[in-house]
Design a protein with these regions (language model features):
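Short phosphate-binding loop-to-helix
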Residues: 109-122
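Long, charged low-complexity segments
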Residues: 112-114, 126, 150
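Short, ordered loop/turn segments at secondary-structure junctions
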Residues: 83-84, 111, 162-165, 191-192
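A contiguous pocket-lining binding segment that forms or flanks enzyme active sites
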Residues: 131-189
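Active-site acidic carboxylates
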Residues: 2-110, 126, 156, 173-177, ...
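Acidic, metal-coordinating catalytic cores used for nucleic-acid/nucleotide bond scission
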Residues: 84-87, 111-114, 139-143, 168
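Glycine-rich phosphate-binding loop signature in dinucleotide/nucleotide-binding domains
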Residues: 124-130
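Distinct, well-ordered alpha-helical segments
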Residues: 89-96, 120-121, 146-148
Length: 245
């Protein structure tokens, strides 16, 4: 009999409705509902990036792109929008739609909060999803405003802090505090990937590993070292087999 402290190992190639997870783990009930998720990537614009001070813009862009790639890989619906893209806020970063061609762009008419735009809200509601993963720039405005409103309307809301950016550390910290008070869940891009990943016993595991490399350069170094070690081991084995022959 398996106990809570014993690992569960599945046979090679076993497929289940949870992509290799034989049953719904107890802990899964507190994680993102992967069957009910919509991703909102809001106002990742070149002009707004120039005012981001709480995270490097390179890291922010990499994390936002990783989320878009995750959505494309796992067929998570995505809605994007931009705030006055023809003005000083600048255009939406192209990487998002390049990584997730299925993403739906909703134009706005100047509303600061995407949730104040009727077409945007209509597009969200038409998906039928009630779990929202939101990232954007600025965190304290473009993420917080729709996040708080959606939460008040009954949505489960996750705010991806490191795929978002703010003009200062103080702005980011106070926003996270307000999220927590309102019941919005602060989360990292890495955690989002992990909560959708759940198990290495799945055919797209290598592609998911690539996403970890995007959000963690150190993980990329680890994977490179592992791959090289595998190559050396294979060469050594081949030489040994040739010598015996």
């Amino acid at each position: 009999m398996n106990t809570a402290d014993e690992p569960i190992f599945l046979p090679d190639g076993q497929n289940t409705i949870h992509d290799g997870i034989e049953h719904e783990p107890t802990g899964g009930k507190g994680l993102i509902d992967t069957t009910d998720t919509l991703m909102l990537l809001l106002d990742h614009q070149s002009g707004l990036f120039q005012n981001v001070k709480d995270i490097s813009v390179a890291e922010l862009r990499a994390n936002a792109t990783a989320l878009a790639k995750l959505a494309a890989l796992l067929q998570i619906p995505v809605i994007t929008t931009a705030s006055v893209p023809d003005g000083p806020n600048g255009p939406l970063m192209p990487e998002i739609h390049e990584a997730a061609p299925h993403a739906v762009y909703v134009p706005r008419k100047g509303e600061v909060s995407a949730w104040d735009n009727a077409l945007f809200v209509k597009t969200v509601r038409e998906t039928g999803k009630k779990t929202l993963i939101i990232a954007g720039v600025w965190t304290s405005v473009c993420v917080m405003f729709p996040a708080l409103t959606a939460k008040a309307e009954g949505y489960k809301v996750y705010a991806v802090i490191d795929a978002s950016g703010d003009p200062s550390e103080m702005a980011s910290r106070t926003t996270i505090a307000r999220f927590i008070q309102a019941g919005v869940v602060p989360i990292s891009a890495n955690a989002v990937i992990c909560e959708f990943h759940r198990t290495w016993n799945r055919p797209d595991a290598a592609q998911l590993a690539d996403l970890y490399c995007m959000v963690s350069p150190n993980y990329r170094a680890l994977m490179e070292s592992f791959q090289r070690a595998e190559e050396v081991a294979k060469k050594t084995m081949t030489k040994a087999q040739t010598a015996r022959a």
